[in-house]
């Protein structure tokens, strides 16, 4: 899948749109097919001034989309649900695994 990542802090040019492994929903997660993202102030601040915690850090805090898989412990969501979600990173990708409680 494709995702927006960065390896060093800096201007918008440090962002790259690259292939990364598909995420997998853990037991408490939902896997979302991302259809819309937001660009938050934190995205801008982090990209400009914070080195990523590991290479190819997927940016983004918030997105909307459709649930395509649910973890074994998830009862509050089902495949096909349209959701919005907020978490600490990873929303600027084609798919995003996020705790169900954050949707």
Question: What is each residue range found by the language model?
Answer:
Residues 10-15, 41-42, 75:
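Short N-terminal binding/cap micro-motifs at the start of the first secondary-structure element
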Residues 84, 102-103:
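Glycine/small-residue-rich loop that forms an oxyanion/phosphate-binding "nest" at active or ligand-binding sites
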Residues 87-100:
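A structural motif shared across PLP-dependent enzymes of the aminotransferase-like
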Residues 42-48:
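Cytochrome P450 core scaffold surrounding the K-helix E-X-X-R motif
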Residues 21-38, 49-90:
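Glycine-rich beta-strand-centered segment in the early N-terminal region that forms part
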Residues 13-18, 63:
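Short beta-strand or tight-loop elements
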């Amino acid at each position: 899948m494709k995702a927006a990542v960065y390896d060093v802090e800096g201007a918008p040019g440090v962002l790259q749109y690259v292939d990364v492994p598909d995420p997998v929903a853990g037991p408490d997660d939902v896997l979302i097919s991302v259809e819309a993202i937001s660009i938050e102030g934190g995205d801008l601040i982090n990209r400009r001034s914070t080195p990523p915690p590991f290479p190819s850090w997927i940016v983004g805090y918030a997105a909307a989309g459709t649930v395509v898989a649910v973890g074994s412990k998830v009862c509050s969501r089902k495949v096909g649900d349209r959701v919005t979600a907020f978490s600490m990173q990873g929303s600027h990708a084609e798919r995003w695994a996020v705790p169900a409680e954050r949707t």
